[in-house]
Amino acid sequence: MGVFSAFHYPKWSMRRKLFGYMILLAAILLLALMAGLFLFGRFDSTERRTFESLDIQMEVFEKDVSAHFDRLAAESLHLSEDMTVFLEEYLAEQEITFSDLTDSDDNIAQIQDLMIEHLRQTLLQEDCSGVFVMWDTTVNQSVANAEFSRTGVYLQQNGYKNTDESILLYRGLAEVGKKHGIMPHRKWRLEFQTDQFPSFDEVCALSGLPLEKSYYLTERFTLPGTSEEAVLMVAPIVGTNGSFYGICGYEVSASYFTTYHAQPTKIAHLTCLLTSGGAQTLDADAGLSCGVAGDYYRTPNGQLSVKSAGDGLSYFNGDEVSYIGLTREISLSPNNQPHTVAVMMLRADHDRAVMKSFLQNAVLWALLLFFAVSCCLYFSRHYLKPILKGLEQIKSEDRTEIQSSVPEINDLFVFLAEQDRQHEESLDAVTREKQTVQQEKEILQSKYDHAQQVYDTAQAEYVRAQEELTEAKKELDRLAYSRKDEIDPDDYQHFLSGIRELTKTEREVFEWYLLGKTAKDIIAATGIKESTLKFHNHNILKKLGVSSRKQMLRYAALMKQLEQGGIADDTCGQAE
Amino acid sequence: MKRYLSVLLTALLLLSCLTACGGKTTLDPDNPVTLTMWHVYGEQADSPMNRLIAEFNATVGQEKGILVTVTNVTSTSKISAQLEAALTGDPDTPEMPDLFSTHTNTAEELGTEHLLDWNTCFSEDELKNYVPEFLEDGTMNGKLVVFPVSKSTYALFLNGSQFERFSADTGVTYDALSTWEGFFDAAAKYYDWSDGKPFCAFDYLIRHVEFDVMAKDGALEYTEDGWYDLQNPSLEESWMKFARSLAQGHIVVSDQYSNTQVMTGETLGGIGSTAAITYYNDTVTYPDNTSEPTNLKVLPLPRSGDGEQYMPMTGVGLSAYATTEQKAEAAAVFVRWLTEGERNLDFVVETGYMPVNNDAFEAIEGYEFPDAGYASLFDAIKTMRDGYTPVVRPAFGGYYDKVDALYEGLRQMQGELRERSDNGESADILAKEIWDFFCSVQ
C-alpha cells in the first residue's frame, strides 16, 4: 500500500491522482506485456534470431552439399565401373593389353570415339559442370613432359543451360569431338597434364582400396587456360585384375556451384561456403561459395579468421569483408579430411540488424510509453471532465436543470437539490423568525425609547428634585444654621438617643423621612398602610422627643450637618 | 487544372530523370544495388572483364554501393538469342540481366524502349571523350542505347612457328598476305605443302566478300529485305574468288571459332575478330601430341586491289535494361569507370579490342605489350585504322539467321567439295556450286 499512499498526498488534484493511477496501471500492463513477450521468446536477441535463421539455413545447405557430392561420388564410382568394363571389352576385342595403348593414336582415337557419347549423356544427366576420363597412357611418349601427359576425354558444359549444344571438348581429340558435334573448348588441349590437374597421384594410390571407398574430392584448382576454378570428384578406374587404368570423375566449377547451390532464402546476402580448413581459419580461396537465389552475396576471399561472437555464432573476418555465421564439419569422402561448411551473413548487415532491432524496440517502447501517457492524460481528462464540470456546476447557483453524463453526479445533484430545498425551507423559517424577532426588537426598541424618555424625564425630575433637595438642604442648612441656636441641646440629645431606640421598621421610616420622602412616597415604597405609617410616625416622634415631623427633620438635618462637620463647633460642643 | 497537372507531371519527370543519373544519388553504400551482367569477354577462358568487375566491386562499387555480378559469360553469336529468350521470360533462361553486351541490331530487336538511354547519364563534355563513330554506332532513334566499351575488327592470325617453316620451304612471306591474290596463292601453296591442310579458317567469310565488292564499286547495295543483291555481277565475282579457294580446300569456313582450328594445327591461320587473341593458346598441339609455340603473328586483312579498303567495325557495347533509377545510376557509374582512359586501354589491350576513349586511343601508341602476339595485333589494328574505312555490320532483321544458314551450309559442303577438287573436278564448277548455294539461302 506504500505506492498508493503516495496518491493520498493532499495537495495533488483529483486529475493528477487519477493520472497517477492510470500511469501505474499502464506501467503494470507494459511490464506484463514485456514479461509475456519474454516468456514467449519474442524478446530474443538479434543474435539469437540470427543464429536460428542461419542454423536452419545450415541444415539446408549442409544437406544440399552432402547430397550433391554423395551423388557425384556414387556416379563417379559407376562411371569408373562402366569405364573398366568398356576398356576391358575393347582391349579384349582388339586383343591388346592396356600398355599397348601407349603411343597408339589409332586405339586412343577409337576409344575416345566410343566413349565420348557415353560421357556426353552422363554430363547431360548429372548435376555437374564437367565429366572426364583420364587414361593412364599417352598418345606419344616421345614428346617433352610426356610423363605428365595422359590421354582421355574431358567434356565441359558451357553457359547456364545444361544442353547438348553447350557441351565443349576441353581435353581429347578435336576430330573425335567434331565428329560427334562437340566443338573444342577455346582452351582446348589434346591431353591432360597431370601436373596441372590435382590429385592424380593421390587417386592412383587409392586404387588399391575397395572401389566404394576409393573416391576423392580434389582441392579447388584453376582449370588450365581459363579463370574458372573447380573441384573434381574423382574415382580410380581399376581393372578386374587390379591394374590401374586411370581416373574419372565429375567437375563442379565454382560458377556451377554458385548457381546450383544458390539458396532460396530471405536472409539478405547470405553467403555459404564449402571449404577445407579448421576451426581457427577458413580458407575461402580453397572453397566453393554460393549465395542467395536472385540476390547477390559478397564472395569470400582469402583467409577468414574465426572468432566467437556468442549465441553459437562466429565472426569470420577477412581482409575486405567480415561475416557472422556458423560452421559445421562435413565429410564428403572417406579419403579427405572433413570439409567445413559455413553459412554466413555480412557482418555489416548483422550489425545494422542489431542496431535496427534496438532502434525498433526503442521506438516501439517509446511509442507505447507515449501512447500510455497520452492515453492516461486523455482518459483521465476525459473521465474527470464531467466530474469536474459537475463539481463546477455544484458551485453554481442554479443546479435545478443540470444533467451530467455521470449517474453518480446526477444522483448527487438530486441529493443536493433535496438539500437545497430543505435548506431553503429552513432559511425561510429562519427568515420568518428573524422578521418576527425584528418586529419584537422594534417593539422593544420602541418600549425602550419610551422608557428612555420616561427615564430622561424622571432623570430631569430627579435632577430638578436634586436641585430642589440641594436647595432644600441649603435652605435647611441655612435654616439649621439660622436656628441652631434655637435648638435645645437636651432635646437634641434626647433626639439622638431616641434614634437608638427606634425599631427596625421605625428606623426604616425615619430614614425615608430623612431622604426627603413624603408619607405617600413611603407608603408606596414600603407597601405599608397609611395607618401603619401614622402609627410608626407617632412612635418615632415620641421616642425622638419631638413634637412634629418638621422638628424631627430639623434635628435630623442638624445631626447630618454635625456628622458632616457642617455646623459650627460650638453647637457640637454644646451638643457634647 | 489540366495545365497544372501537366506542369506537375513534367516537374516530376524531370526530377526523376535528375535523380536517375544526375541529381541526388540513389546509391547507398550500406545497401548496395546489384547489377547482373552478361558479357562476351573471355568465354571459356580467363576473362579480363571479370577481373575488372572484381576490381570495381572492391573499390568504387564498395564505396558507392554497387555490386556487379556476372551471371553469364557467353559469346556474341549466342547472346542475342539468350537476351531475347530472357526478355520473353523463357522458363529455362535466367532473368533479364541489368547490363549486357549487345549489338545495335540486338538492341533494336529487344526494343529500345526497354533500354536505358545513356545520353541521360553522361554529359555532353563526357561524351566528347569517346570516339564519335562508336557513339554513333550505338545510337538508335536518337537514343544512345549501346554504349561503346570496346570495338573490334577482323585480322589474320597465323601460327608463326609453322609459317616460318612454310615460308622457308616455299618463299611465301607475310608481305605476300597483304593482298587477297597473294593470300589465295599462299593458301594454295600451303595446301600442297601440308599435304592437304587448309591454310586459313574464316569466321565471317561473307564480310570479306562484301569488302571486296566495296573496294571495287565503292559501295554495296542490299536488297529491300536485307540481303545481298545476287544480280550484282561484282558480288558474284568477289564471291567466286573466295569460293574457288574454298572449293579446293585452301580455306575453310571455321567450325565455330577459327582460333580452335589454329591451335589444333588444323589450319595455319584464321581470320576472325581481333578479340579472338584472348583465346589463342601459347602452343599449337597436333594430333600426335607434339606441340610448338604458336608465335602468334597478326596481320591486317588482305587488301582488295588498289582502291579504298574496308574493315569491319564490330564489337558489342554495353546496354542497360531500363528498370529502376538506382540501377540506371549504378550502371552509369560502372560504365563511366570501365571506359576511363587508362582502364579502357588496359582492358582493350588485354582483350584485343580497339579503345573507345580518345585518350586511350592516343596512349596505345606507346603501350608496352605483354607479348609479341599482342604487339603484332595492335600493329595490324593501327595499319587498318590508318588505311581502311570502318564499316558497321549489317543490322537487317533476319540477316544473321541467313548468314548462319549460309555458314552452316558451307561447313557441310566444304569437306565434300575438297575431296572432289582433290579428285580433279574443276574449281570453277565447284565454286559455281557454292555460288548456287549462296543464291539459295533465303
Q: Where would I find each of the regions flagged by the language model?
A:
Chain B
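Conserved N-terminal structural module of periplasmic/extracytoplasmic solute-binding proteins
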Residues: S6, L18-T106, L417-Q442
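Short amphipathic alpha-helical coupling segments at ligand-binding clamshell hinges
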Residues: P48, E237-K241, Q326-L338, K402
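Extracytoplasmic "Venus flytrap"/periplasmic binding protein-like
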Residues: Q62-E133, R165-D169, L268-G269, P287-T290
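Hinge/lid segment of periplasmic solute-binding proteins
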Residues: F100-A155, E181-F184, P293-P302, Y367-D371
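Extracytoplasmic/periplasmic solute-binding protein
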Residues: N141-V149, Y154, E181-Y228, T267
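Glycine-centered hinge/linker elements that transmit conformational signals in sensory
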Residues: F184-Y191, T223-D255, L301
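Extracytoplasmic/periplasmic substrate-recognition and gating elements
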Residues: A247-Q248, P287-P355
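Conserved C-terminal helix/tail region of periplasmic/extracytoplasmic solute-binding proteins
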Residues: E362-E365, F369-Q442
